[in-house]
From Swiss-Prot:
The family this protein is said to belong to: Belongs to the cystatin family.
Provenance organism: Mus musculus (Mouse)
Residues making up the signal peptide according to the UniProt record: 1-23
PANTHER family according to UniProt: CYSTATIN-12-RELATED, CYSTATIN-14
Keyword Ion transport assigned: no
GO molecular function: cysteine-type endopeptidase inhibitor activity
Record's GO cellular component terms: extracellular region
Protein's name according to its UniProt entry: Cystatin domain-containing protein 1
Entry comment describing in which tissues the protein is expressed: Located only in seminiferous tubules (at protein level). Expressed in testis and Sertoli cells.
InterPro entries reported in the protein's UniProt record: Cystatin_dom, Cystatin_sf, Cystatin_spermatogenesis
Subcellular location: Secreted
Amino acid sequence: MSWKVPMLVGLVVLGTHIWTINKEFLDVTKDLDYFVASVEFAVAQFNDNNPEENTYKLLEVGRAQKKTWTMIFLMDLEMGRTICKKHDENIHNCPLLQGSREKKVHCVFQVDARPWFSHFTILTSTCVPT
């Protein structure tokens, strides 16, 4: 009986540790293939869901993290409004709007990537004007 108590305590500690590790986000390089694809997906979804006429393009990637044991990415993105309209060709080369129509947003996205199925899902997104 006396050996069961330490074993039970050990299992509880180990289980808690594993559960905690599973919830952590760790930094990844910003050029990691699946992270880059997730960023592109997040920007495209932002543009598709944004009611504005003009598209936004990526200006800067801040935080780049991946949840341990998953393909869930956490990212901070700064985007700027361009002169291009939605569904224009080659929006990557569109210049930013200047003057009174200039607008930038800071967004935090969580993207679940399943690249082997070509499937990405936005889990959470929060955007604020900067």
